[in-house]
Structures are given as C-alpha cells and as structure tokens.
C-alpha cells in the first residue's frame, strides 16, 4: 500500500512536468512598426536571463542588431523572432534595426 504522502507529492511533480520549458523565465517584447522600435527604451532586471520577443509588424524585414549585446537576428516582415539574453550587468545596451538605422534604434537598460 502506498503511503498517504505519496499521492500529493506525485501530483505536485505532475504539475511541474506540465509547465512549458522556461516558464519561469522573464519575457519582454519589442515591436517594430513603421521602421521604429516600441518601446525605444526597455528596462530589464540586471543579473537575470530573459527572453526578448521582437515582433515585426512591417511588411519588410528588419535586422535587430546590438554590438553591446553581441547579437543580431533578421526578423522577416509580419513575423517575430526570439532572442535569449543575459544575465546582464547593470547598464545601457544599445540596439538598432540595421536596415533602417536612422529610425529604428533603442536601448535595453538593465537595473
């Protein structure tokens, strides 16, 4: 016969297994519209790994590029891309849309 504490523990493990991978991770979204990033400044917690979803609402592709973060990713028009960033030290990290650098620019501020 199984001990009474076995079933609650088994149920708890089942709930943990049902969570999607990375459900505990932080997630932030940048939107590209009219060749501009929104928001232009994104605040994130320093010292934490996070997911950055870049949604491109324009019909043309844009390249998210950051020399500070050592990341670049082409986001096709009307689609989205995901980058895993961090953990970052406190500071400001600039990024641009390489295909429209005059208008598509911003920064991630780790606090």
What does each model-identified segment do?
Residues 24-47:
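N-terminal edge beta-strand
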Residues 54-56:
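Asparagine-centered strand-capping/turn motif at beta-strand->loop junctions
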Residues 1-11:
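Bacterial N-terminal signal peptides that target proteins for export
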Residues 40-42, 70-74:
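Beta-strand-rich interaction surfaces with strong enrichment in secreted/lumenal proteins
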Residues 18-20:
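N-terminal signal peptide c-region/cleavage motif recognized by signal peptidases
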Residues 24-29, 76-111:
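Extracellular/periplasmic metallocenter environments
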Residues 50, 60-62, 104-106:
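Short beta-strand/loop motifs in extracellular/secreted proteins, especially
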